[in-house]
Amino acid sequence: MVQTKICGLKTPEGVTAALDGGAAFIGFNMFPASPRYISAEDAARLAPPARGRTRIVAVTVDPDDAFLDRLMTSLRPDLIQLHGRETPTRAAAIAARTGAEVIKALPVSDASDVDTAAPFDAAVTHLMFDAKAPAGAAFPGGHGVAFDWSVLKGRRFSRPWFLAGGLDPWNVAEAIGGAGAPMVDVSSGVERGPGIKDPALISAFLEAVRRA
């Protein structure tokens, strides 16, 4: 069964919709430039209903050690997603410092970008293939942009992986088939405005994944 991560949650209603729909992961975006930004402390206040029902992911961009220490004291996520320019060495150091599992997000525009995953095999527990952000974008991910899913079809990776980028309730089944994805990640595709999650769209997305 394909697993789903609902990312960029900011409200109790969004968290509830994700939990009720059976999301395997929920994500809180810690990057201040994103319209989905939430502080670690505010995310910690939303997290209690999720513990034991799903896995909590902190989405970060080039986090420093001081931030990581604060994150592990407040939110205590199960996984840390790295969505910046982190190297395999830095990713491994983050895993060792925090004790959390680590997702490395990799920007993709064509098949050659998929090959950038290999150096992270020994450093992280999960991979994510996300559409490359538009030129000049202030933040990575969450732009509602897709890439050619077929560049992932038939590829084998040593780590579990997520497909992300431009997914929504209407195209996720096609995306899963086109990429052969074992896990999917959605953010802007379940919003009614930038950073504003729609519980009905969250439910529809999770149902579409179940039916895929």
What would you call each of these model-derived segments?
Residues M1-M183, S188-A212:
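Conserved N-terminal beta1-alpha1 strand-loop-helix module at the mouth
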